[in-house]
Curated annotation (Swiss-Prot):
It is an enzyme of class 4 (lyase). The gene is vgb. GO terms for molecular function: carbon-oxygen lyase activity; magnesium ion binding. This is Virginiamycin B lyase. Substrate binds at residue 215.
């Protein structure tokens, strides 16, 4: 059974979390308008100006991290020394590293998915339905959840956009993570996990509590699927044989979730904490 190792209190609405190669935890504070990191047990934060940009999704890279501000219409980069830089973007939300060293991000309100090459040039794909989270698979296929479109989109390496409607109406897909055989995603409003194959075939897996409101999902190196249950304040685990177990979390509203290099997990509780969990 998973075990809570520590709880770090952080005000300001922790939302997204990511862990870099050294084990440093980076996070966004959506309510405060800040980003931060946890270094040797010490919380360090960097205020953003203006503070109402809603920093949400964050991705560690090198000595810093990238993050999105969908209300601020920009993508930020924070360095280990606290230095900030920004790129202009239209309502960015989901963010991931591209195989060519560039970035992929979603335009939550503008109905687009954008690839930013290492040289700064951008290619935009029109993808309606409130594109939310995004992830690129090893073969270059990009998966995107369409929260209002009730679908999952795939962008092939040659740039074709293919969309698969979900079997359950009004499922509200959000969180997404790639796996060896496609991608896993959560259905916030239907209380289900979903899996999409590389060919677009979708299967759905109901949770024990259909009102749990799953939000974020990650896939561990061993293939275990972990997910947060926003309404139920729990961390869920699905093993390869389909068994689901759940761990009650302190506080409320778990959002972001990340796997550390040592295999432990971090959960962002929007009620004001970062929770460290042993699998």
């Amino acid at each position: 059974m998973p075990e809570i190792l520590e709880v770090v209190d952080v005000d300001g609405g922790p939302y997204g979390v990511t862990v870099d190669e050294t084990g440093t935890l980076w996070f966004t504070l959506a309510a405060r308008g800040a980003v931060g990191r946890l270094v040797d047990g010490t919380v360090e934060t960097v205020a953003l100006e203006p503070a109402d940009g809603s920093p949400t999704v964050i991705m560690a890279e090198g000595d810093g991290a990238w993050f999105t501000e969908f209300r601020g219409n920009r993508i930020g980069r924070v360095e280990a020394n606290g230095a900030l830089s920004f790129l202009t973007a239209e309502s960015p939300y989901g963010l991931c590293r591209a195989g060519d060293g560039g970035l992929w991000y979603t335009e939550l309100s503008a109905g687009g998915v954008v690839h930013r090459a290492p040289d700064g040039t951008t290619t935009r794909h029109a993808v309606e339905g409130m594109p939310s989270m995004i992830a690129e698979a090893a073969d270059g296929t990009v998966f995107v959840t369409l929260n209002q479109g009730n679908a999952v989109a795939r962008i092939t390496p040659d740039g074709q956009v293919r969309t698969t409607a979900l079997p359950t109406a009004g499922a509200g897909p959000v969180g997404l993570a790639t796996a060896a055989d496609g991608a896993w995603f959560v259905e916030l409003l239907a209380g289900q996990l979903g899996h999409v194959d590389r060919d677009g075939t979708v299967t759905e897996h109901p949770l024990p509590d259909r009102d749990a409101r799953p939000h974020a999902v990650v896939v561990a190196p061993d293939g275990t699927v972990w997910f947060t249950e926003w309404a139920a304040a729990r961390l869920g685990r699905r093993t390869a044989d389909g068994e689901i177990t759940e761990l009650a979390l302190p506080g409320a509203e778990p959002h972001g979730l990340a796997v550390a290099p040592d295999g432990t997990l971090w959960v962002a509780m929007e009620s004001g904490a970062l929770v460290h969990v042993r699998p």
